[in-house]
Amino acid sequence: MTTSLYWQTEGEGSDLVLIHGWGMNGAVWQPIVEKLSSQYRVHTVDLSGYGYSAELGSADFDEMVAQVLAQAPEKSAWLGWSLGGLIATQAALTAPDRVSQLITVASSPRFAAEKGWRGIKSAVLSQFTEQLKEDFTLTVERFMTLQAMGSPNAKQDIKQVKRAVLSRPAPNPSALATGLTILADIDLRESLSQLTMPVCRMYGRLDGLVPIKVAHDMDAFIPHSTKVVFEQASHAPFISHSDEFITELHRFLQPEDEFLI
């Protein structure tokens, strides 16, 4: 069965797909879409179970990737934030001819911590899963707060994310639960060497969900990739440091151009 996700397309230029993270929806990109649309044809999606795709319910990891690929442009750059980074990476591995460049933001091929690998402790993920059953709205709000922790403008960042996300229908609780399972279980580390397109990895140095050590450990997994660290950012650098973020993104996507914001 083909399931149609909700997409928005704005601007003119080369195609750029933006994929949101857990508990969020495509509206989270709106502040930067306005700036990017002067240079790119920007495609934002609400993943299955989120925003205007909430009624589609839950989809597992491979289904989510297939759903996005089914409606994405024939060939474009893909940018995934957090959980969206896993989806963008898997799409690049599954259909390398469709992904011209891969950008991951505040993402990790393995979100869960384990011996020798920094990440989210399994107890924290379990706690979120339990809290979801009691009050999923409050759980998503807590997650937003966790994302902005460490950022100098944390309160402002949370407010902006919340406003954008709450402008669309609430996420489907089963999709939220599936998303946490993906964050707990998926491990793409051993597949990363198969990536054939240019890769850019962006991180916030103060990120509490994707520790900065992951950024450095990843150098060994994708040695020829571009690494960008936003020194004062946490988990959402495209919100807290949008101008710097867009400059770095453009530098990677179109290195021959000078970009004026």
Curated annotation (Swiss-Prot):
Any one GO MF annotation of this record: pimelyl-[acyl-carrier protein] methyl ester esterase activity
Keyword vocabulary terms for this entry: Biotin biosynthesis, Cytoplasm, Hydrolase, Serine esterase
DNA repair found in the keyword field: no
Subcellular location field: Cytoplasm
Main location: cytoplasm
Domain AB hydrolase-1 per the UniProt entry, residue ranges: 16-241
Cellular-component GO terms for this entry: cytoplasm
Keyword Cytoplasm: yes
Catalytic function, reaction form: 6-carboxyhexanoyl-[ACP] methyl ester + H2O = 6-carboxyhexanoyl-[ACP] + methanol + H(+)
Active-site residues, as the UniProt record annotates them: S82, D207, H235
InterPro entries named in the record: AB_hydrolase_1, AB_hydrolase_fold, BioH, Carboxylesterase_BioH
Pathway linked to the protein: Cofactor biosynthesis; biotin biosynthesis
EC numbers for this chain: 3.1.1.85
GO biological process: biotin biosynthetic process
Positions of substrate binding: W22, S82, L83, F143, M144, T145, L146, Q147, H235
Top-level EC class: hydrolase
Subunit structure comment from the entry: Monomer.
Family membership: Belongs to the AB hydrolase superfamily. Carboxylesterase BioH family.
NCBIfam families associated with the record: bioH
Function, in words: The physiological role of BioH is to remove the methyl group introduced by BioC when the pimeloyl moiety is complete. It allows to synthesize pimeloyl-ACP via the fatty acid synthetic pathway through the hydrolysis of the ester bonds of pimeloyl-ACP esters.
Protein name, per record: Pimeloyl-[acyl-carrier protein] methyl ester esterase
